[in-house]
Amino acid sequence: MRYAHDECRRQGGKHVTFAPDTVHKLDLTGDGRDDYIVDLSETQCHDRPATYCGTAGCTFDIIVTLKRGGHRNVFSQRVLNHEILPGAGAKTIRFMLHGGYCGLSGGSPCSKTHRITARPFEFKQPK
């Protein structure tokens, strides 16, 4: 959440308004601990509407709770949309991404899936 305030200020915005569902608390790793999805798609940086969203989607973070305490941000990228797939244990998320992540043009979105663990991950565009 601090990122949202800092980025808004860096962009010349005055203040941030968070949507009620900006932070989702749920067990993503299957270990019984609360993990968090932070989705800034409905967050507003007043006077700077494109701060958190653009053609590649909106800022989206996954923060997991570690077994020995503390938290780790395992994913931080812009996504167009996401879907948590059904199933027991660690959750798999389908991410809708800018087409560039699949070698397509930006106007053609693509999907990638990832099973959530405590290991950080990111999607990279092909070279």
Language-model segments: which ranges?
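Residue-level detector of short, conserved catalytic/binding motifs and their immediate flanks
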Residues: 20-21, 34-36, 60-61, 112
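Acidic/hydrophobic-patterned starts of short beta strands in beta-sheet-rich repeat architectures
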Residues: 28-41, 88-98
